[in-house]
Amino acid sequence: MMKMSEENLEVPFEFGECHAHIFMDGKNYKKAVERHKNGVDESVIRSHFACYQTQGIHFVRDGGDALGVSRRAKELAPEYGIDYRTPIFAIHKNGHYGKIVGKGFDTLKEYTALVKEVKTQGGDFIKIMTTGIMDFDTDGGITGEALRVQEVKEMVHIAH
């Protein structure tokens, strides 16, 4: 735990990263994916974790990926004193936003199988993609089409 001093007052604090994708590098998505194409490049994970350590980050909530990187990161995190939580991969409806960080489904039966797969692989939570992402070119609009409310309710019910 890091401490800062202000007028002889010791204030303990820890930092957390609450929206990470350990497989990405913040520079070039395609190159980041390419690094893990033939298997997880553990050096990328270790580099991120070493950086987190130096910055006092002890908690990471990852959004998952379809490459197995966050699954491996979950195994390595304790070596760095990091509490790492991941859904392993996000779940999206095919044809909607989410392909870059997860696996898709067409039917609720397929969705149910993906929920079971997350649990089998040791996921800490279920991440479902229900909308697109913010489109800053349209003053805060959302890209793509959101899922229907009833469908989202059923997905949440299945996940529980």
List each language-model region with its residue ranges.
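Short, surface-exposed amphipathic charged segments that create phosphate/polyanion-binding patches used
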Residues: 97-105
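Short, acidic/polar
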Residues: 41-49, 105-119
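A generic secondary-structure micro-motif detector
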Residues: 37-38, 63, 104, 142-145
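Metal-associated gating/positioning segment near the N- to mid-region
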Residues: 10-76, 97, 150
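Divalent metal-dependent hydrolysis catalytic cores, especially in the metallo-beta-lactamase
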Residues: 44-71, 81-92, 123-137
